[in-house]
Amino acid sequence: MEARIDEGGEAQQFYGSVGKRSVEWDLNDWKWDGDLFLATQTTRGRQFFPLGNSSNSSSSCSDEGNDKKRRAVAIQGDTNGALTLNLNGESDGLFPAKKTKSGAVCQVENCEADLSKVKDYHRRHKVCEMHSKATSATVGGILQRFCQQCSRFHLLQEFDEGKRSCRRRLAGHNKRRRKTNPEPGANGNPSDDHSSNYLLITLLKILSNMHNHTGDQDLMSHLLKSLVSHAGEQLGKNLVELLLQGGGSQGSLNIGNSALLGIEQAPQEELKQFSARQDGTATENRSEKQVKMNDFDLNDIYIDSDDTDVERSPPPTNPATSSLDYPSWIHQSSPPQTSRNSDSASDQSPSSSSEDAQMRTGRIVFKLFGKEPNEFPIVLRGQILDWLSHSPTDMESYIRPGCIVLTIYLRQAETAWEELSDDLGFSLGKLLDLSDDPLWTTGWIYVRVQNQLAFVYNGQVVVDTSLSLKSRDYSHIISVKPLAIAATEKAQFTVKGMNLRQRGTRLLCSVEGKYLIQETTHDSTTREDDDFKDNSEIVECVNFSCDMPILSGRGFMEIEDQGLSSSFFPFLVVEDDDVCSEIRILETTLEFTGTDSAKQAMDFIHEIGWLLHRSKLGESDPNPGVFPLIRFQWLIEFSMDREWCAVIRKLLNMFFDGAVGEFSSSSNATLSELCLLHRAVRKNSKPMVEMLLRYIPKQQRNSLFRPDAAGPAGLTPLHIAAGKDGSEDVLDALTEDPAMVGIEAWKTCRDSTGFTPEDYARLRGHFSYIHLIQRKINKKSTTEDHVVVNIPVSFSDREQKEPKSGPMASALEITQIPCKLCDHKLVYGTTRRSVAYRPAMLSMVAIAAVCVCVALLFKSCPEVLYVFQPFRWELLDYGTS
């Protein structure tokens, strides 16, 4: 949570000479409409004003200095409950006057060693030097040992005898050492890509700290000249001239050496060598990456200059970065865009719908240096749409401090994404030509689209390059669990990814235009083997919790690595627990990245996310048009294939709420054309059939789906079930509909050829179906002959209250309302009712006749003439002979 200045707080120092504000803007002070791209300042008890002649085009932008200022002060009496970005990783609402390191103690029980004067490494990991090398220590009531590679405590069983690192990290370290060196890139020198990205990190760092010092523009010139040397010598010359010409402008560079180096002074000659030796080569000899302590901060960036860990920093990969005067963040590798969820969770997964052009959801990131939300023009959304030629079908935005980081999620055609990223510099030129707003034409702007990035200075594109490093060198998200959460519960997230704990990594959680406060949990990070990636990579898991402020919508989990690499992953917020449980089935599928099933699953999450977002906006949705019916149909088909009853019900509810297509009186007919009940019968899904038969839309009285609804060729669901094998359960459900039209339609409903469902069953030899329906018909007719009599519960009380006018009744009299039809049956139906007893009488007569015959046979003396003597029953013997 970001702290703010209290009115009674200590006066701050202003850099009036360079026109900077005292503190960075606070996310709590602004209400951002992510759909209209409008920033509205909230009513606060404290307002910020610049000193003197401070300019609106430049403000404090330090990710380090201002972060310390935010942590050094606190606002009192703030009970508005606004959601803010937890930049410093604290979950408490108030902070001490200044965050110092004097209070750090060893985490080992009964140690309490003061870590204020020890090395930064021991301070960050909260372990004293003695226990970091001890063979055992008690932490959390468990005997453990500190791992030198993981920089955290493990159980003793995870260590081999005499080893200071756990077996898992040693195994990964040995595998990396045995791997052969990668083949050179297309330019013949793979270290050039590393050097370019180090320069980009340095440039971003300078721009974020340009308020700290004044003078000296040579540093920026050297960096940019070296950065664009790969693109051409002439571009570098033009860039330096551009920077020199802008020296007296409002957005001129005021940069000091310490802004780059993170120390008090640094030799300028080192920078010249850094620029001159860009073409040099060096063998790659990288050590194990540095990792943080087990309770690492989800939102903080550990790149403070005083926290630089020289002894654990990896050796440089290029002689140009070999000086130890540079902080460790200069030597770190920056990630490429190789994963389908880096910059876009579906960058490699086009939509599976049958639209004319394949669509994809991605994002564009703008970092506007020296700007504040009040400088956003009212027509910002229109400017973005004009720049993109109105190609996005859906668009949503977020802002957060760090000057201003404007993140735009949008859905547009794959060809539009390719056109935008293939020549980002030309595309940005169109944006700058279309608008003369100071937001775009003054100061520095950093733009990121997929693996392309660009820098804009005073309305001109000065850098346009791409990132291309191995995936093991950057952070990205593999999966987020749960994929769908109920709005009524506290969200407990588990984020799985690569290099989540490396230096300079931030994990952000955003929902419907807002960033949420993340509460860290102790021992939340674990490492496990990755079964679907290269064995040299290690999968890390981060657990944290946060409160969901909405009932329904879509959110994103974002990871950011020093401004160069970024990755995001969508998740859903739904009020129905059954919907959440069904969508969570996709969690396992999404972990197998690169497969067709994973691509389709990610498309589904994006599409239903946009639908939930539009359904939440309602009539205030600024996106052009309505949610197309063809996209809705693809969502229905995807859910129907997986037999998700709750998801289908949710989609139908949103359809009748008007979130899909042009809702009118013909919407029922439009939905009937999808033949959902026919699809469910073909899937042989009895739960889906039962749900559809009992689904009644809002503000309607009758069921929408009927078992006698005619589809293609006049086929009804009954026809389909009668012709399929093993459809007893589905047929049973179809004939148990609320209106009981299924039984009637079994023998009366005909297709285009004149056959009934019963005829289909006879032709296919499904006589069990016929017997099943016949039993139901017989049961129905028998039930209709019975008369239900309502007998009072307390009849004795009624007798006591009523006076007895005559002798005590010997029988219960049931009064019945006169009915002509009943009287008619009583008069003319006596003979027919007596026939019901005729079979019993005949049976009794037959039994009596048999008994008489047997008796006569026993008492008579039958004679068999000419063969035997007269036969008598009394003379009959028994035995074997």
Curated annotation (Swiss-Prot):
Start-end of Polar residues biased regions: 275-284, 319-338
Biological processes per GO annotation: regulation of DNA-templated transcription
ZnF locations on chain (SBP-type): 103-180
Biased composition (Basic and acidic residues): 285-295
GO molecular function, a single term: DNA binding
Keyword Zinc-finger in record: yes
Function: Trans-acting factor that binds specifically to the consensus nucleotide sequence 5'-TNCGTACAA-3' of AP1 promoter. Binds specifically to the 5'-GTAC-3' core sequence.
Record-given protein name: Squamosa promoter-binding-like protein 1
Source species of the chain: Arabidopsis thaliana
